[in-house]
Amino acid sequence: MKKLKRYILICLGLILSLQSYGSKSLFTTHVTITTYNAVRSQCDRSPLITADGTKIDNRKVKSGEQKIVAISRDLLYAIPLGSLIYVEGHGYYEVRDTMNSRFKHRIDILQHSSKKNFKKNNIKIKLVKKPPIKKKNKNRKK
């Protein structure tokens, strides 16, 4: 009887792990979301360039072609720059920027300056895709 119980528990564990592996989200958490504009007063000296070097095109931001978020630094361990996340109620965004270190457990959605800024608490976000790992070329000449 003990062997049967152990076998059932092992099978249940495998089923649960396979179900979570098969889901599309790699990491899920609840955060505060805010919005920002690509202007000097809300960014650094180069507001049209993100932390990973992506150039912001305000026309694409306004039309929704370029959907970028900045992420608080405490979340970078699980959601690295270049990742694709799903923000519940808002859609898919690329993580291209980082926030000031004083902010914790927060994401900042880039939006055009013509839209009204907002803040929402306890919004679910899901990591959908991590960026590809860049391999170092060992045969590169110096």
Predicted regions and their residues:
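Hydrophobic h-region of N-terminal signal peptides that target proteins for export
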Residues: 12-21
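Sec-dependent signal peptide recognition
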Residues: 3-11
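Solvent-exposed, well-ordered loop and adjacent helix/strand elements within mature globular domains
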Residues: 21-142
